[in-house]
Structures are given as C-alpha cells and as structure tokens.
C-alpha cells in the first residue's frame, strides 16, 4: 500500500509496467509519500500543508495515463481519472466541474464499503450459514420433549459440515432475499445535478425493506446471503464519515487532456467556454467546499495531477491562476527504439506475453527471437516518425497486423512452435513499413 511505501519502492513498482519517464515517476512517488508525511505532522501545521499539484507534459502514448492508472492501484485512496474536455462552463450544456468531487465521493463510498464489508465477512459468513441451514432444515416444532431438539442439533451439524465441504452446492432451494429496486437513470438539465441525484435517491429508497422469494442453487444463495448479512453489519453513518475523511485527506484527481481547454490567443470562437472551464476548475484546485449527497467535502487537500500533450497550445496558455496551482511540472520523453524493445520484453504484462498466453490456449507455442523484437521496435518507431506519433500504442497495431494470419489459423497450427524473428517480421510488415501511404492507412 502506498502509505507505507517509500518513493523508491513506488518507482520500482511503476517500473514493472512503465518504461522510462523517471522524472514523472519520481514526482508522483514524492507526492504520494507526502500524503503520509503530512499525516505525521501535528496540528495546526498539518492543516496548512497542501499537496503540490503536478502537471505532466508529453506526447500521446508515452505513459501519462498509464502512470495514473497504475498509481490508482498502488494508492490506497479514492482516485478518479477524468477528461477535462467533458466539462463546460456553468450555464453551458455539459458537465459541471463539481461533479468531479461527487464522482470521487461515490468512489470513496464504494471503496470504504468494500473495506468495511471485508472486516465483517467472517461474522457475515456465519450468519449466512445459519440462514441457509434454517432453509435446508426448518426448525422442528417444540412439543415438550428435549430429545428431538438434540437430534435436530446433530442433524444441523451434519448439514453444516456438508455445506462447508461443498457437497450441497448444486441443491436448489427457495429463500427470501431483499428485493432491490431496479436502478433508474434520470437525465437532468446541466447545473441541476443535485436535484437529479435527490430524485434518484428517492426512487432507490422506495424498495428498501421489501423481500422477494427466489429459487437458486445453494452456492449462489450463500454468496448473496453473505453480502446481505455484511450490509446489515456495516454502519452507514460511520461509513459516510470515513469515506468523506478519506476523500478530503487522500483523494487524487487525474485531469487528462488539460491542454484541450487551454486558450490559444490567436484563435477566437469557443475560447470563452474553455476559459470558463479553467475558472470553474480554479476554486476546486485551490480549495473549496462542494456539496454532495453524503455531506460537504473540502477539496483543500485533494491532489490534482493534470496531463496533456500540448501540441497546439503551451502550458503558458492556461490562465495564470491555474498555472500557479500546478507548481510541479514534468516533461515526459518521446519513446526511442530501445524503449519500444523494453516495452515488448521487460514489462510485467508485455504484449509479447499476452499474445503467447492467448495462443497457448490453442496449443501454439509462440517464441519471440531477439532480432524479431528489435525489428518490431524499429518498425513501430519508424511508422511513428513518418505518419503520426502515437507512442507505445503503435505497438498494438503492429503486433495485431503481424499475428493476424497466425491468430486466424491458430487451430491449424496446434502443437507447433512459431518463432518470430526478423525475417518473419519483414515478410509480413516490411512492405507496409517502407511504403508511407500504406503505413498511413494500415499501421
């Protein structure tokens, strides 16, 4: 978990999935560690220490989003990734920036609920087991003798043992479960998210407490009963307080495509709305209080990580106030041939490993020779240079094209070993890589 990991440990964890980009990894690792450091500082100074937001600048496909995605798994904290382009200035058609915090709160509630339900799982399993046994063995009526009760208890123990061993899994039973209301998606006008949420909550609450009889197998029933019993053991009010505290102290927001809302001085037209989004984001980033259905949430200590390619605009095109709220700037490098090679061989779930695993299900043994990997990396790099630089994503296209025929006829090659060397790569991709017009449409 991130709060106990040192920056170097966080970086080495990210290294398993992302090649290079050490500056960005370091910045993110330090920002995560600083959350833990801040918690160790005594009040009132702790309240004054705010996170230093990060702006990642670099072309598409070099690892900006992947760093955020992997960070989400590492960070034991509410995390949300959103596209800045989805939001519009208040009053325009589109999403209001306050929904960022509401979505983050939903994420935190879900995360906290899962964590709390794990804590009470053992108790919930016992209660679910008893409810199942009550259905399988309805209690005998008391007629004044104690012996049947003893016999009943022994039978119950026998059934409990069978239940734990799984020998009753396929038996069909009928039992009463909470009847959840079907979820309703209500579309509301922009700026009226609060009212829409209240209406949705009101409809969701109509079905509470209702029961429905359902027929199912014991195995499925056991899972549903565990969830139902765990939900009873979790205190909803306490859960809300924990989730809100978690959002306020540990929340992370990843703002992708922030360059798309930067105003370019020489272009007119829709710039008002773009600047408006930036101005709406400003109070959120510098610290404000947002109303959610779970309560008021302060954004003072939420960490914001923004990223953008900045091809058509520059970070200086953002409004000065917003620029000042992202003091840590990190430039990500374009990928070289060596980087492409490393991506294909050194990452934990590399594309080569994925294709080997997929084709092994058809008994095809796929072997990648070093010269084959090198040639693939050269072709991906070359096409990026000639056509459009889409970074590591080019490897998906190249690999898919390379193995298209093999994947299609995999059943015919069952039991064979296929070696991907430079000659194999050139045979299938050589002409495409050389011909720029073909590359533009195929690769």
From Swiss-Prot:
* This protein's encoding gene: hslU
- GO terms classed as biological process: protein unfolding; proteolysis involved in protein catabolic process
| Classification via NCBIfam families | hslU, PRK05201.1
Residues holding ATP: 19, 61-66, 256, 321, 393
Recorded protein name is: ATP-dependent protease ATPase subunit HslU
Query: Main role?
Result: ATPase subunit of a proteasome-like degradation complex; this subunit has chaperone activity. The binding of ATP and its subsequent hydrolysis by HslU are essential for unfolding of protein substrates subsequently hydrolyzed by HslV. HslU recognizes the N-terminal part of its protein substrates and unfolds these before they are guided to HslV for hydrolysis.
GO cellular-component term (any): HslUV protease complex
Q: Where in the cell is it found?
A: Cytoplasm
